[in-house]
Structures are given as C-alpha cells and as structure tokens.
Amino acid sequence: MSSHENSKNNMSKIILRDYQLSVVNETRKRLKDGFNHLMVQLPTGGGKTIIFSYIAQNAIPKGKKVLILTDRDELLKQAGGTLSDFNINPYFIKAGAKIIDHRKSCFIAMSQTLRKRIDKPDWQKWILDEIDIVIIDEAHIQEFNYIFESGLLDNKMVLGFTATPSRSGKMRQLGLDYERMVRGPQVKELVSKGFLVNCDTYDCGSPSLDNVSVNSQTNDYNYSSMAKQFDKPNLYAGLVKNYEKYTPGQKMLVFCCNVDHAIKTAIELAKKGYPVKFVSSRRAKPKEPEIGCTEGKIQKYKESVKAYEFYKESYDQLSGGRKSVLKWFKETKGAILINVDMLTKGFDEPSIEVIALNRATKSMTLYLQMIGRGSRVFKDKLNFTLFDFGGNAQRLGTYESNKEWGLWHEEKKGGSGVPPLKECGITSKSKPITGSGEVKKGCKRLIMASVSLCPFCGFKYPEPDPAKEIDLQLAEIKDANGVSIKVKSFKLMNYYELKTYRQIKEHTSAWLWRQLWIRGGEKELRAFANYDNWSGGTTQRAVGFCRGKF
C-alpha cells in the first residue's frame, strides 16, 4: 500500500454536505448492526460518487482494500476523478488489463472486463483473499448479477449506490443481493436546500400507447413498437413549438424511441436553424443474406440497408464521434442533443436547462435517470424545464414527488400509486379557467390535482359551488336497453347509481371523489372505498385530493 494512499494528513478537495454525512453515518450504523450488503439510495445529483469515495478514503488507512464496480467508461472516469480529489490513486481494471497490481488498495473495474476474468483462479483468489469492501455504482442495473451469482461476495462488505433502487418484470430482485436499504433525502428536500434545481413540467400530450408492445423481461415499452407511434409530423412540430414558446435558446437534451426517431427529430430541429446533433452507438453495415434465403430475410435486409444509409448520411451531417459530440454540446450555447438511452447515466452536464421526453416509459428508474440529467445546479440556473410527450409524469409522478423504493418488486393491487396531476389553469375537461386571484391565466405547468394555488405562478382556482355540483344537477340512469329508470339528484343516489352514472358519463375519478366528499366528507368517501374495494393507495389519493380542494 502506498504512503500516498495511507496518509490521513492529506486533506481532500471535497467537504461533504450535512445530508451526505448523515448517509455515511446511517450506513456505518447498519453495518455495525450486522447487515453487510446494503443498498444506498440518493437522488441523481445528490453526490453518490462523493459519498462512496469518502467511505473508501476512510477505509484504506485501516488496511482495507476497496473494489469499485461500474458499467460505463464515463462512470469509470468520473469515479476516478472524484477518488483523486480524495487523494486516492486507484488501479483501473478495464479492457486490456491482464494483471492485478497487488500493491494498490483501491481498484476501479469495468464490470464487463471483470466478468471475463471472474472464472480465472488468480482473479477469484484476489477477490476472496484481498478485497474487503465492494462498492457498486448504479447498482440497480442487471449487469452486476453475475458477481453475486458467483458467490465471491457472500462474505464481503457490499455497498450498492443508485438513485433508483427498482427493478420490474422478470428481472432478478434486488432483495436477493441486498439486506437493507439506506435512504438519503428526497428530491424535494434537496431542491429546497438549493442542492438541486426545481423542475417545471409541461404535459405536451401523448400518442396512444394501447397498441405498443411491452418487453416481458423489462416490463417496459418495446423501442421499435413505440417509435411507430411517435414518428408523426405533429409530434416533431410539437417539440419545436414548445421549445420556441417556453425555452428558446436554452440548452436541451432530448430522449427518443430509437436511432431513426432520434435522427428525424434532429433533422426537424436543424431545419429551424437550431444547433443540433444526435449521438448513438455506431451502426454496422448490414451483411448480405445467403443465396437462396427466404423472401422475408431479403426484405429485412433491404430495410436494414435503407436504415443504414439514412444513418450514415445523417451521421456525417448531424453527428460524429461520441467524445467530440459531447464536447460540442458542453461548449455550445443553446445546443440541442438528441439520444435514445445512451445518456441516461454517467453523463454529467450541469448546464442542461431543458429535458424533452419524446418517448414513453413504464420504468420509474429510466424516467428519473432521464429527467435527472437536468437537475444539477449550475451558475445562475434556477430551474430546468421538462417537456413530456409520453404521458410519463401522469404515469410515474413529477420529478419532485416522493418515491417509494424497495428491494422487492411486487405487483400493486390497484392504481398507479401516483397522485393525480393537472395543468395549471386548465379544467378536468381540458378547458381554460379564469383565476380568482390576481393571476387570471394559468401557466400550464403540471401541478398536484389537490392544490388550489399554483406554486409556480400564483394562479388561484375559483372555489367550487357545492350546490351547483350536487343539488341542482339531475342524473338520469338507464338500464341495459337504454330505458330511463331513475332521475334524481346526486346526493340522493345510492352507491350503485352514483357509480353507474359516472361510468355512463365517463367522468374522472376526481368527479366521483368530489360528490362523495361534499355529501359526507371523509367518512362517506371511505365508506364508498370499502364498498367498491379500492386499494389503500387509491383511498389515500382520494382523501388527499379532497382535503386540498374543500
């Protein structure tokens, strides 16, 4: 072990924030309690790399050896740079590394490289005999499953770090590899303290996703199937229109469905004269099919050639090498960068002011990784803007909303678990409404459906009129043949009639909640919830909505 690594007198260039020290102390407490495999959760931009570098710095002088695992080159370099700020000189294990420098006390390994070495006796012996602490960056991804399945970490101290400890579908459950979770502060707290910036979310509509296929392994939308729904002129025009209206000249990162979709999006923005590029993995030239192959294979080959030629032409005009494109994006004022999922993690560019989700996802992990790219504090940046073209915020919640994380993913009994949202100044029937305060026109940002005062612009919703909503309305209930069977006011309806009327009129859940609350408050609402077998989450959302409204 080098004296440089051992020296406790070397002052690091980084001082931990209070909440980061709290996370470190909670982690130490859990380890003392006997839990050796811990998942540490902290929002994107909260300083996970700083925390685990601090832990490594404190462990090395005690004779401990630390192995840090990551899955991307950017993360490798980022971790290496932060460790250097803590006066640690790590040994890098990446492509081409054939030997281990046993003199070192800290190692950073590309997971893909270690995977290729893991079956070799000398590498196994090194992990078993020398490594004391294993730190895993972006621990939620499945790339690291093999190291747990190997059994080499069974008796090691393992600390997994991620902003999104969540898996779904048929993925290996995190609870198989981690015993407990250490939770850091939520996004809302970090925003309030000035460590992250606030997000202004605009719901830009979404194409129908009813016919989009879902990947059974990831439980998320299939890329090519989704692209067919998003490859439409009105959506390309919508991105340009919203950018020009709300954030002209600001630096924007756009996420698309697939490479062709990313290229077409870049072309549309380039037509308007904006500085725009796309970045993607290099697309290889298709191989010619064998002689005598089926007509289907020939047709598929022709389609692949067409896509390759489109990519090649666009690559020369609107892209380039990954490093050069990212350098251009960093240095160019008002630059717009289009990608698919290449920049969801390990990409740190604080100057990003706008995130555009030109796609949909069912994955909370992917959703937060994408929008988290805009959350970092930078110079005079007070907030970042999210343009949501995939209904993601309605499906998964806003950036600041509290998230429930767990090591085991279980199917929910009902509801999405996401509080209902609304556009500021817009009614449930998508019509503008005049504010009752000084601000007469809403800002159209997404806000909680339960609030009557917009926290962004100060728009105040007019007070509802209970008499107008209930006493003066008559509801007509018809049987299966369309024959009228009852006409009565809402407050006199029984539960079956009220539920049936709502279904006939296709009213929202919020409409039903209001009727129940006005005629009997929380007690009436909970009684109906019991009658209709609502889940606990749905009941709580309904109560929260009504408490904020009335």
Task: Locate predicted features.
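Conserved pre-motif I regulatory segment
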Residues: 4-41
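Conserved Walker A/P-loop ATP-binding site and its immediately adjacent core
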Residues: 50-51, 60-85, 259-260
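Conserved interdomain linker/interface between the two RecA-like ATPase lobes of SF2 helicase motors
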Residues: 180-256
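Conserved helicase/translocase motor-coupling segment
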Residues: 223-292, 315, 319-328
